[in-house]
Curated annotation (Swiss-Prot):
Subunit structure: Monomer.
Family, as annotated: Belongs to the methylthiotransferase family. MiaB subfamily.
Function as written in the Swiss-Prot or TrEMBL entry: Catalyzes the methylthiolation of N6-(dimethylallyl)adenosine (i(6)A), leading to the formation of 2-methylthio-N6-(dimethylallyl)adenosine (ms(2)i(6)A) at position 37 in tRNAs that read codons beginning with uridine.
Gene that this sequence comes from: miaB
Official protein name in the record: tRNA-2-methylthio-N(6)-dimethylallyladenosine synthase
Keywords: 4Fe-4S, Cytoplasm, Iron, Iron-sulfur, Metal-binding, S-adenosyl-L-methionine, Transferase, tRNA processing
Domain MTTase N-terminal intervals: 10-128
Binding site for [4Fe-4S] cluster 2: 165, 169, 172
Lineage of origin: Bacteria, Bacillati, Bacillota, Clostridia, Eubacteriales
Any matching Pfam family: TRAM
Location in the cell: Cytoplasm
Acyltransferase recorded as keyword: no
Domain Radical SAM core: residue ranges: 151-382
């Protein structure tokens, strides 16, 4: 395989599975390739490089990767110079890279979560030497700054502030595949945000597996609340969001920063996972139902108009009907504006995988459907309250469902679709909400 053969068509295609951190990793892979003269395509048929950036939080994500990898066999047959690369969390699992190469020997490059910055080097080796490259680092290295990044949006951007997780929830594989917590220096974060603002970006979402742990291990004396206040001082920036927060670490200082900093949006993603104190203990979440509800009350009392969103796992080992009803009642009490609901998925090498009393699939699905129905009913009622109100929306671009409309979000994260000129993209506009829908709002520009 030669460089010349592969350069006839310098197109690449990236498929991203999983969370926002994976999305930002893919933006970096795209940035590295574009800096080498490649262009992105969504059509695998015309790509000379295909990358799968994988997730392993749930079995379903892994099955999708295996299915899509199988479909690439014919493409590789048609074009032997096609380079197929697999990376991300799924590859970081013990034995997974070898399993992939055994089942799909036509894969050219495999790497994990700690060495994505080396992708150009791996690609060069494949193109120049015709070798197969597999490199999974078992230990996280230092944070690599300054990688080129190809952002999906021109209006809003993800900025990672820390990597890894130290919490070891019993159901979760993230600490095993993303490593221990490491924080970026605040000066590097501020520099990245200032560069984004200079390019016209208006909104930043700060990312981390647990943003509330930010600052641990750094030489400088700073915590997450301190970082939020620093980011709030960046001139020209309009809005700041963050995710994900662990309830046990969401401090009063962070709540007050959201309240007092004008650029911080009134939206908190606060994963509860279960409304049962017994199950929360089994999950190793380090808080109980009462602690969580007290935290919610504190947030609501300090931050008017705050919206709360969450993650919930249904069917954790040993979950009884009573435990499930505790979750339902907690959702009713909190009144979430949206919730990411998941059926528990067994993950190898996690404590929950070895637990007895795994819940049968039919019970899991029944509880899941009941939960989704209850949450959606509440969301519809909450969205109805916006009808007739005037809200400030940052215009993000054309609506996904109707390209004749524009779309954007309120400060507290509500999605609003409306008719307007494309010149408004990137602008803050006032919209009157004329109709509420289950998952979005319809607005009209206020002249």
């Amino acid at each position: 395989m030669t460089l010349e053969n592969n350069m006839d068509k310098k197109l690449f295609c990236i498929s991203t599975y999983g969370c926002q951190m994976n999305e930002e990793d893919s933006e970096k892979l795209s940035g590295m390739l574009k800096s080498q003269g490649y262009e992105r395509t969504e059509n695998k048929e015309e790509a000379s490089i295909i990358i799968f950036n994988t997730c392993c939080v749930r079995e379903n994500a892994e099955n999708k990767v295996f299915g899509n990898l199988g479909q690439l066999k014919q493409l590789k047959k048609k074009n032997p110079n096609l380079v197929i690369a697999i990376c991300g969390c799924m590859m970081q699992q013990v034995g997974m890279a070898d399993k992939v190469l055994k089942t799909f020997p036509y894969v050219d490059i495999i790497f994990g979560t700690h060495n994505a910055h080396k992708f150009p080097e791996y690609l060069h080796r494949v193109l120049q030497e015709g070798v197969q490259v597999k490199e999974i680092l078992n230990k996280e290295e230092g944070i690599v700054e300054g990688l080129p990044i190809d952002r999906k949006s021109d209006v809003k951007a993800f900025v990672t502030i820390m990597y890894g997780c130290n919490n070891f929830c019993t159901y979760c594989i993230v600490p095993y595949v993303r490593g221990r917590e490491r924080s970026r220096k605040s000066e590097d974060i501020i520099k990245e945000i200032e560069e984004l603002v200079s390019k016209g970006y208006k909104e930043i979402t700060l990312l981390g597996q647990n943003v509330n742990s930010y600052g641990k291990g750094l030489e400088e004396d700073i915590d997450f609340a301190g970082l939020l206040r620093k980011v709030n001082e960046v001139k020209g920036l309009e809005r700041v969001r963050f995710m994900t927060s662990h309830p046990k670490d969401l401090s009063d200082d962070v709540i007050m920063a959201i309240k007092e900093c004008d650029k911080l949006c009134e939206q908190v993603h606060l994963p509860v996972q279960s409304g049962s104190s017994r199950i929360l203990k089994e999950m190793n979440r380090h808080y109980d139902r009462e602690y969580y509800l007290d935290l919610v009350k504190k947030i609501k009392s300090e931050i008017p108009d705050v919206t709360l969103t969450t993650d919930i796992i249904i069917g954790f080992p040993g979950e009884t009907e009573e435990d499930f009803l505790d979750t339902l009642s907690l959702c009713e009490e909190v009144g979430y504006d949206s919730a990411f609901t998941f059926i528990y998925s067994r993950r190898n090498h996690t404590p929950a995988d070895k637990m007895e009393n795994q819940i049968p699939d039919d019970i899991k699905h029944d509880r899941f459907n009941r939960l989704v129905e209850a949450i959606n009913k509440k969301v519809v009622i909450k969205n109805k309250e916006y009808e007739g109100k005037v809200v400030e929306v940052l215009v993000e671009g054309p609506s996904k469902n109707d390209e004749t409309k524009l779309t954007g979000r309120t400060r507290n994260g509500k999605l609003v679709n409306f008719a307007g000129d494309e010149k408004l993209v990137g602008e803050l506009v006032n919209l009157k909400i004329v109709r509420a829908q289950p998952f979005s709002l319809i607005g009209e520009i206020v002249e």
